[in-house]
């Protein structure tokens, strides 16, 4: 029973870290990264569609993203969606390809990005701690039902605390790496 609870907690914690890694990948780092387009959806034949499903995205140079729609009629819609987004990048449309030139990051922009990284990381840590709390609540519920002994509960609580500590250290390492990446560009 405890093992099942711990395994589910492990899965949830891994998913939390995966979400963090994806979110951090989508944060601008002064170089071209197709992940910055992941959250942008384009109105295409009446449906909101991710850019990645409408076009090939390549990186011809370190700070340039090239978006080549499979259907040329989607060019204007893609351009409009990028302009509406919070990317802060003006697309260059030559009728075939949309180019996004990623600007150099200013010191102020870097600090804002690092602040967002820290907030995102803190949200992930809160989620991990919430998973720990859920597990401890489940252990206490089992104790009330007299399904497990006090010793087993203590052992389970220690194990979930160890997992929590490991995942939080992992998140800290991921955040530190991303912060260094942003500040060293």
UniProtKB/Swiss-Prot annotation:
UniProt signal peptide: none
Gene: frr
GO cellular component terms given for this protein: cytoplasm
Family, as annotated: Belongs to the RRF family.
Record-given protein name: Ribosome-recycling factor
Gene3D superfamilies: 3.30.1360.40, Ribosome-recycling factor (1.10.132.20)
Subcellular localization, as worded in the UniProt entry: Cytoplasm
Stored CDD domains: RRF
Alphabetical keyword list: Cytoplasm, Protein biosynthesis
Superkingdom per UniProt: Bacteria
GO molecular function: ribosomal large subunit binding
Purpose: Responsible for the release of ribosomes from messenger RNA at the termination of protein biosynthesis. May increase the efficiency of translation by recycling ribosomes from one round of translation to another.
